Amino acid sequence: MPRFAFLVHALGPVHRGAIGVRSFNPGLFFQWRKGQDPNDISVLCDLSIPGVVDGVVIGIPLLPEDMLSDQERALERMVSAVELAGDVQAVGLGSLCAVVAGRGEALADRVSVPVTTGAAATAWALVENVKSTLQPGQGPVAVVGAAGPVGRAVAVRLKELGYALQLDSRRLARSLDTMGDRSLESVVAGCPVVVGAGPTGGVLSPLALEDGATLIDVAIPSTTTGPLQSGCTMLAGEALSMPPSWKRGFWGSVYHVLAGYGFQQVLACLVEPLALVVSQRSQPFALGRKVELADMDAFGEVATSLDFSVKRLPVRWHGR
């Protein structure tokens, strides 16, 4: 049976405490320990599509600031997490695991199986959300975070599909012959749809959004610095509906909720290593700073064949 691992880290003290509950580690639960010891890493849950694929989620109880401030330590903990996962054919990366240490490249050099960052799946889900929200010609789409791997792939694909774009990357805007500006307020002005494609948020005032605008967001925390104004909508840009055969058990259900998935959906980045092992690809869908559109499309084909689909999921603002 194909098997994958998905690595995550604690997004805050509550998540670190939850990892302590799952691993029966009172030091983490009561916040005596900071999650920096390799022995604090633990299995969070098992996931599966019976008869098709098995997966294991491994929790690294380092907070975002810990991941960013000491990336060599973060890399070593990710290596330990892969070792804990056991026999797997691919490794996926969640949140800042996909950003630190060369966006997966340093980890790929240290382990013997493909490492995929989730960027192709995230980009695919964002594009599908835009397509279900706005038709080409109905107004411009703003892409915040267009200089990053996900934002660039989204912008290039939307341009191919005929959407008018406004980007926060002047360089990419020039190459696509579209509007670009460093001022985020200028970028989102007049846009009925805004894509928040950066890995981290807290960069845009909610007052800058047009009345009735839809923010399709994947940033953690949210792209905006506060809750959206009345009439505006935020969609979870990575949310995918689960196939009927998806199995997760008790701890998998707990993980779904604490990770922000909810009971009825998963995030696309988790599905990326799943699709990788099911398709028996030897190369990742995404690694490093670039997402190839062909790889994004290949992920979409596999995910769709397994009954994963984009779910238009309104969510509340999630700040720090």
Region spans (language model):
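Glycine-rich phosphate/diphosphate-binding loop of Rossmann-like nucleotide-binding domains
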Residues: 131-198
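N-terminal Rossmann-like NAD(P) cofactor-binding subdomain of oxidoreductases
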Residues: 94-102, 113-116, 168, 173, ...
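Adenosine-phosphate binding glycine-rich loop
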Residues: 20-29, 226-320
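N-terminal, charge-rich interaction modules
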Residues: 1-31, 38-41
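Structural motif
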Residues: 7-12, 61-63, 93-96, 144-146, ...
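Glycine/serine-rich phosphate-binding loop and adjoining beta1-alpha1 elements at the start
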Residues: 45-46, 50-136, 253-267, 271, ...
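Rossmann-like adenosine-cofactor binding region
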Residues: 178-249
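Short, aromatic/basic amphipathic alpha-helical patches
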Residues: 103-112, 175-179, 226-230
